[in-house]
Amino acid sequence: MIDLSTLTPQLQATHWGWTIALFLWFIGLSGMGFFINYWVRQKNFVYVLTFCGIAGLALVTSHLGRLSNLPFVIFYALRDFSFNFQSWMMIGIVLLSLLSVGSVFYSMICAGIIFKGSKWQKLAQSNGFNAVFSVLGVCSTIYSGFLLTQAVGVSLWNSSLIPVLWIMSGLTSSIAMLELMSAMGLVDHKSVGWCSRTSVWVDTAKLFAIFSFVYVALGSEIGRASCRERV
């Protein structure tokens, strides 16, 4: 069996650069947006989440070394049915690929492209269909947080609270996007009227997560020394 890990090695976390911030924002917005969409189910919101999911997948894929080998890796992995699920990058690409492909399918139903007719519209509005995207979105958001915890030697990143913080951040971003789209008349105002009230509680929970995150990160002498080196 071919060792595929040598074909597209993951770049070290400390060399990811500024694009990692865009990846985290896009995936947080798309992932938790699909969680919120379980109750909202607005097609324009789905379009935005689809774009964010695809952009996040493209950015995380760009952090693979020797990117030109990726088509060969996909081919051999599918042929031999050999997937390295011990790799965070592999798990992430699978999750984000499912989210991206699924969201494109969702968007095509909403836009009436190829998948036309009332049966497809009923599918897009069904609880089970949206529950699948909700779970997949939350898992993708949690993954993006766990990916950061794998960084070695980067202050404040290797904390177990990072995934929790990312869920709170994703919820905040998705609710803010809904409020913005509501103000622009892109979504039904009545369906998102609860956003203003919910955003207060989400922001409060996010602040609590941030303070807990900093407290845990600075709770040891090693953590404090590491932060002092970064200042």
Give residue ranges: language-model regions.
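Membrane helical hairpin/interfacial module
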Residues: 27-95, 102
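Cytosolic juxtamembrane amphipathic/interface segments immediately preceding
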Residues: 7-14, 80-85, 115-122
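Long, contiguous internal "core" modules enriched in hydrophobic/ aromatic residues
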Residues: 17, 26, 42, 94, ...
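Membrane-interfacial helical/loop segments at transmembrane boundaries in membrane proteins
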Residues: 1-2, 73-77, 224
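N-terminal signal-anchor module of multipass membrane proteins
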Residues: 1-40
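Alpha-helical transmembrane segments
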Residues: 1, 49-54, 134-136
